[in-house]
Structures are given as structure tokens and as C-alpha cells.
Amino acid sequence: MRRTLYRLMIELTNGRFTSYILRKFAQSRLSSIIIPSYAKVFQINQDEMEKGLKEYRTLHELFTRKLKEGKRSIDTDASSIVSPVDGVFADHGPIEDTKTFDIKGKRYSIVDMLGNEERAQRYAGGTYMVIYLSPSHYHRIHSPLSGSVTERFVLGRKSYPVNAAGMEYGKEPLSKNYRSVTEVNSDGEHMALVKVGAMFVNSIELLHERDTVQKGEEMAYFTFGSTVVLLFEKDMIEVVQELKSGQELRLGEKIATRLAHK
């Protein structure tokens, strides 16, 4: 009963109309009134921000803020995969040959996540990684590796929350939420960067439109905290052993190593 009620409450508060109203408020000058308290509550690191707090005219501008030059460095090892965001490392593990994986007691379908069987088949037997962004984090998304962009597409119409409660009670939020997917071919192997929308605000803005992308290059931004899921082909990477669930990650930090193939 509790699970059903929670899901119903989520459904009633994250449709397009609600998201539209919240987005309009966040983009209005009226929202500037709550910027100081927002920054305090979420403990935003103001020393890293490109501009002073008072220079942000709306909550939207604060959500999508840039960082000062040099505040993040991208790992330069040619074999490294880097974190595409500032966030909290949630989980990683194998993708089953059935094109599914388990996280937080839920089974996720790669077919559902990517929209069809053909896309999902590439990642059977591969590896997934999940990174959660809170409202306090830097919200811009960068590429974890270099390669050629093979496809960009959007799926889903609503968004369950992706915090602990949402992951427990939501209806498979990582594969059902509004999400924007970019697939990259890197030296003949594929990676999917799945950008998952958060509760209320469905907006994921794409910034990168070229056919190629470089490791660390800016690709998109969230207009609120959310989650990214990385999918890699079989035998493509080895996750850094020291990574632990709940660990804070910074953009550009090494999270995996490309495996050499003879």
C-alpha cells in the first residue's frame, strides 16, 4: 500500500504541466529571492563558481552555473575513462547476457533504457556505472572518453525521483524516466551516456552537436540534480577498484581503464 501510494504521489507531481510551472519559476527573476537560502541549504561551493552568488539572476542560472577555469582537471592517460560529472558514485557491475542489471534491489532492462533490442544487444555482458547528482552539484555533463558520436535520442515522458526513496519506491526510474542518450564509438567499441531526468524537472539541455567528441568535452547540462548511467561493451573497461558506493566524484577523475585488445 505504501509503495503504491508513493508511486501515485510521484506520478501526480512530475507530469509535463508541473514541470513547466517549476521550470518557469526557476527561470524567472522572482526565483532570485531564494538563491541565498538555496545555496546555504545545499552547501554550494561558491569558491568554485564562475560568478559571485549575487550575479546569478535566476535559480536556473545557478543550477546551470559554470566553474572557474582550472577548477577541474581531466585525467590525461590515453587508456582512462573519466567521470563525466561531479556527483556521488552509486554503483557499478556487470550487465547480464539477458541485457539486464540489478541495482538497489531492482532489475533494470537495457532494452527499456535504450528503447530497443538492437541498441541493447551491444552492451550484453558489458559493464554499467551509475553516478547521482544532488541539487548541490555542478550540473554540466562532459564526455568520459573520446570518440565518434553515433546516435543521440530522447526517451520517456515523466520522471520519478532518483534519490534513495525514489530508487526504492519508484518504477525503475533509471530506465523509465525522461532521459537523453548519447552513444559514442571509441576505437570500435561503444559507450552509452544515459542522462536521466530528476523529479519535477525534465529538462536536459544538449550542448554538443558535432560528430566527434573529446574526453572531458562539455556535452549537456541538467537543470536540476539527476543521474547519469554509463554503459560499456563487454571486455571494454575495468572499473577502478578503489571506487566505493557513496564516494564523491569530481569531473575528470579516473573511474575506469580501457582494456587492451590484441
UniProtKB/Swiss-Prot annotation:
Metabolic or biological pathway, per its Swiss-Prot or TrEMBL entry: Phospholipid metabolism; phosphatidylethanolamine biosynthesis; phosphatidylethanolamine from CDP-diacylglycerol: step 2/2
Residues that bear Pyruvic acid (Ser): S226
Known partners and oligomeric status: Heterodimer of a large membrane-associated beta subunit and a small pyruvoyl-containing alpha subunit.
Catalytic activity as recorded in UniProt: a 1,2-diacyl-sn-glycero-3-phospho-L-serine + H(+) = a 1,2-diacyl-sn-glycero-3-phosphoethanolamine + CO2
GO BP terms, alphabetized: phosphatidylethanolamine biosynthetic process
Protein name: Phosphatidylserine decarboxylase proenzyme
Compartment(s) of residence: Cell membrane
Catalytic residues in the record: D86, H142, S226
Entry cofactors: pyruvate
Organism the protein comes from: Bacillus cereus (strain AH187)
GO molecular function, one term: phosphatidylserine decarboxylase activity
UniProt-listed NCBIfam families: PRK03140.1, PS_decarb
Cofactor annotation remark: Binds 1 pyruvoyl group covalently per subunit.
The protein's Enzyme Commission number: 4.1.1.65
